[in-house]
């Protein structure tokens, strides 16, 4: 009788422990769901790491969200300071490249067409929709393993989401089938009560802020140069010499400042392509058949033609800083690659990196194959 009683107690203990585990998982997800769904707006900061072959690209990330599908994602490559902004508002989706004062605009389901490691809503959807998710309690909180959805990159199969003891997302890692990290997002700040103005989701606001910042930097540089010139002249020259020197020095300083401003404008564009950049990946039975460099109005265009079983063209061309902000209507969807944000459609992949605009074009290859070629172009060209 005692043995039977002991056995029943053990069975009940197993059920209680099992039940507590399920309750713990459901309570964590319930709390996370409530937090995210109740947030009318939020602001996020963090770092994003993307692995490409043997290289790791790191971005500083800032995300702003406001209800009714307003998103602004600011991505800054920490290696070359290349900045791109993904913006969604009632007018559409934009990929903004401030360095060249240019935007691509297109109609897209982004960010709902695949997993997003830095957006809370899509992350929550991935958790809720995966009936086979795995939940685990950790010393610092909990870990949830769910399937990842990246239609254009079959290599990315699952994502590990780490939460702290207050059920705040701290880290998201996207893994391949060998459990090797390919994308990592570390959250340093999540403000679910952030009061965001509607204006920050307007393209004009982004453009105006960037231009105002550049103008302020130019004025500060000019003021400092004039101040330094006058101070040095006053110390080393007498009063009479100073009067003449000030005139000449100020003139020289103004000319120097103008030259520096002109050089600043030059740095925003690349006039020629010094090195030919070849893809590290070429489909089977495909070869380079022609290479042609042509001049255009403000730079050069390089056309590489590949023939064979899987023909395609790779076009590389210099980009020019636009004096008036240029909006280019585009068909396709956006894809965050290792070093930049690309525009992908059925026949091409297009992106800007290091003041060079790239196109991979083919009517024979799939989107996935086009992106494989694009991702293999990871060597930055030398420009002059």
Regions found by a protein language model. Give the residues of each.
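Short, surface-exposed coil-to-beta transition loops
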Residues: 56-60, 80-83, 154-159, 182-184, ...
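Short, solvent-exposed recognition patches
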Residues: 74, 223, 251-354
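Long, intrinsically disordered low-complexity tandem-repeat regions enriched in serine/threonine/proline
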Residues: 222-258
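N-terminal leader/targeting segments and the immediate start of mature chains
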Residues: 2-5, 9-70, 228, 238, ...
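An acidic-aromatic
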Residues: 62-118, 180-186
């Amino acid at each position: 009788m005692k043995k039977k009683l002991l056995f029943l107690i053990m069975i009940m203990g197993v059920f209680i422990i099992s039940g507590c585990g399920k309750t713990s998982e459901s309570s964590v997800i319930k709390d996370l769901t409530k937090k995210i769904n109740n947030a009318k707006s939020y602001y996020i900061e963090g770092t994003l790491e993307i692995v490409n072959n043997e290289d790791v690209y790191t971005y500083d990330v800032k995300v702003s969200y406001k209800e009714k599908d307003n998103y602004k994602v600011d991505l800054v490559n920490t290696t070359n300071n290349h900045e791109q902004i993904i913006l969604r508002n009632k007018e559409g989706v934009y990929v903004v490249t401030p360095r060249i004062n240019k935007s691509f605009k297109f109609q897209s389901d982004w960010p709902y067409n695949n997993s997003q490691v830095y957006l809370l809503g899509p992350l929550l959807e991935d958790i809720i929709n995966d009936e086979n998710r795995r939940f685990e309690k950790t010393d610092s909180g909990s870990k949830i393993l769910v399937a990842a959805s990246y239609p254009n990159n079959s290599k990315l199969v699952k994502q590990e989401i780490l939460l702290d003891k207050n059920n705040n997302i701290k880290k998201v890692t996207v893994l391949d089938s060998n459990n090797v990290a390919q994308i990592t997002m570390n959250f340093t700040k999540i403000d679910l009560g952030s009061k965001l103005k509607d204006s920050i989701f307007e393209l004009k606001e982004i453009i105006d802020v960037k231009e105002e910042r550049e103008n302020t930097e130019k004025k500060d540089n000019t003021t400092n140069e004039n101040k330094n010139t006058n101070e040095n002249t006053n110390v080393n020259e007498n009063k009479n010499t100073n009067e003449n020197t000030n005139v000449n020095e100020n003139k020289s300083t103004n000319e120097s400042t103008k030259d520096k401003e002109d050089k600043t404008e030059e740095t925003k564009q690349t006039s020629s392509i010094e090195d030919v950049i070849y893809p590290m990946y070429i489909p089977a039975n495909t070869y380079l058949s022609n290479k042609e460099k042509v001049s255009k109005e403000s730079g050069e265009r390089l056309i590489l033609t590949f023939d064979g079983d899987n023909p395609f063209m790779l076009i590389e061309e210099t980009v020019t800083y636009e004096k008036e902000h240029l909006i280019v209507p585009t068909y396709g969807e956006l894809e965050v690659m290792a070093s930049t944000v690309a525009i992908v459609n059925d026949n091409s992949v297009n992106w800007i990196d290091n003041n060079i605009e790239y196109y991979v074009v083919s009517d024979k290859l799939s989107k996935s194959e086009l992106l494989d070629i694009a991702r293999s172009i990871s060597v930055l060209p030398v420009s002059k």
